Amino acid sequence: MPSATTASTNGANGASASPAPGNLSANDNIRRFAAPSRPLSPLPAHALFNDKTRCFVYGLQPRAVQGMLDFDFICKRSTPSVAGIIYTFGGQFVSKMYWGTSETLLPVYQEVPKAIAKHPDVDVVVNFASSRSVYSSTMELMEYPQIKTIAIIAEGVPERRAREIAYVAKKKGITIIGPATVGGIKPGCFKIGNTGGMMDNIVASKLYRKGSVGYVSKSGGMSNELNNIISQTTDGVYEGVAIGGDRYPGTTFIDHLLRYQADPDCKILVLLGEVGGVEEYKVIDAVKQGIITKPIVAWAIGTCASMFKTEVQFGHAGAFANSQLETAATKNKSMREAGFYVPDTFEDMPALLKQVYDKLVADGTIVPAPEPVVPKIPIDYSWAQELGLIRKPAAFISTISDDRGQELLYAGMPISDVFKEEIGIGGVMSLLWFRRRLPDYAAKFLEMVLMLTADHGPAVSGAMNTIITTRAGKDLISSLVAGLLTIGSRFGGALDGAAEEFTKAFDKGLSPREFVDTMRKQNKLIPGIGHRVKSRNNPDLRVELVKEYVKAKFPSTKLLDYALAVESVTTSKKDNLILNVDGCIAVCFVDLLRNCGAFSTEEAEDYLSMGVLNGLFVLGRSIGLIAHYLDQKRLRTGLYRHPWDDITYLLPSLQQPGPPGTEGRVEVQI
């Protein structure tokens, strides 16, 4: 049997001794379990599970697996019941699960043969494969002699396939639980998948220790109700199986009740049948023949079917009476006549079960065991938070979008309204960047900026970097980033600086001449002033477009007017010291923030200090950089190498030998 590899243990379940606080590492909270040295001893013929049962879970079902491990932990098993996961759609990896409050790693296998070879102690498979693939996966699993029990969870398995599975399983001596089942449970030992519900329900139903009552039902949901009834009226469940609601289950009532009959620890049998099928009559025959002698408390659900004028299909595929013999009323009558304990209604079942239990306790057949200490339930953090038991500060805060509901929200605006109201890219930017709707002219201005800054030809540094990177064979993201990384104070990034300097001078009340003189005395260039190509006589049409729009639409253009006055001063000195597109956009954006009515003075200053203006240039220029990438790819251009004649080489030369102490000096000759 595999065992935990921790060297020293204390407490329940062999919990690892706490390491010294100064020696903690990321792996100190992970429990590891050694592989088994040999297969387990075979179980008695009547037993499917014990406290050493190990299984595979077929399919990626982390919640079900975690529920099984939590059950193992509170039952004080020494090892997890799940040895590994078989998931055919991914490579081999490990899945991290909780073992109590620690963590453990479960192997995930892509192929059944590898899983079987690694775990000779596994004899149970919980098959979560879909109805389309469950047939092939189950048939494959049954090829391995070590597999003795398979639970098929899927609903909708074709009846012919279900009958084939049952036939092959019977021939090979394999027990099939399902299809269309929640599974089964053996308290204190093993549970299949999601059987028993959540951990608080399992503890409330006392499924962490064995009782004396074995039940079998068709319905998985009703098996949960039986767990509750049995825990309140007796010493608890010994074993419970839901055979599934399909018409052709792999095993039937009689198969499991015969196992319970052969098990000396199971004292009372409970049968919960339903309308449809004739499996209850096999149990009746076994009782009449004396094969089953233990008391059976039984009920067939669906007595209300007689109230309808026509036959009614209930929830399960097999819950349909094709004859009078298959009706719930006839079944209950036949079971009562055969000596079963059958209540008048399902509501009377708990009282009748308690009556039978008390009788067996009185005659000494059942000796109630002392009630053990109720185990502590490990609670997932998310579940505890949902119940309001704990609180924790969030690691991140987002105030711009929310994808948790049925519809994506941009700053509280549903995405459907974004399209319905046709707010455009500028409107979306206003919602996500500024968390509010800006006036239409402001949204239009944002779009205008993106269009004007989208590209400025292949010669600028950003485009050149993108082109060279693309021609080196790099991908789109790498080529785009190569161009974006050139954006700064010298290329494209003058917007924030221009906004800061012009705003500071304007707010101080400096005249345009005083502003220019102040910057000259500080030996600073004025951001947003000057162009390498354009001049007063050869104006930048982009600037003209911005000025024309802003003058026509903005309620106030005080800072733009101030910048144009500064331009008059600078161009009197040199013709190309014009207000360039960066400077024009910057001062107009400040006018927008201050005068559109959507921002307070403090908010306007905050957004400027955040670098929102450079964000406009980055967003706009990304369009052009991607265009240059696509252009070079489309042209199938090769690796770029710069020509030698465009490079001036100035290499150092070593000085001729001279006086001692001058060795190794380097002179640069120009």
From Swiss-Prot:
Gene3D superfamilies with a match to the protein in the record: Cytochrome P450-Terp, domain 2 (1.10.230.10), NAD(P)-binding Rossmann-like Domain (3.40.50.720), Succinyl-CoA synthetase domains (3.40.50.261)
Residues that bind ATP: 257-277, 308-334
Binding site for Mg(2+): 274
Reaction equation(s) it catalyzes: oxaloacetate + acetyl-CoA + ADP + phosphate = citrate + ATP + CoA
Gene Ontology molecular function, alphabetical: ATP binding; ATP citrate synthase activity; metal ion binding
Annotated Gene Ontology cellular component terms: cytosol
Active site, per annotation: 316
Keyword ATP-binding belongs to the record: yes
Region of interest (Disordered), residue spans: 1-22
Record-listed E.C. numbers: 2.3.3.8
UniProt-listed GO biological process terms: acetyl-CoA biosynthetic process; fatty acid biosynthetic process
Record carries keyword rRNA-binding: no
Residues bound to CoA: 335-345
Keywords for the protein's UniProt record, in alphabetical order: ATP-binding, Cytoplasm, Lipid biosynthesis, Lipid metabolism, Magnesium, Metal-binding, Nucleotide-binding, Phosphoprotein, Transferase
Main function: Catalyzes the formation of cytosolic acetyl-CoA, which is mainly used for the biosynthesis of fatty acids and sterols.
Family to which the UniProt record says this protein belongs: Belongs to the succinate/malate CoA ligase alpha subunit family.
Complexes and interactors: Composed of two subunits.
Name of the protein: Probable ATP-citrate synthase subunit 1
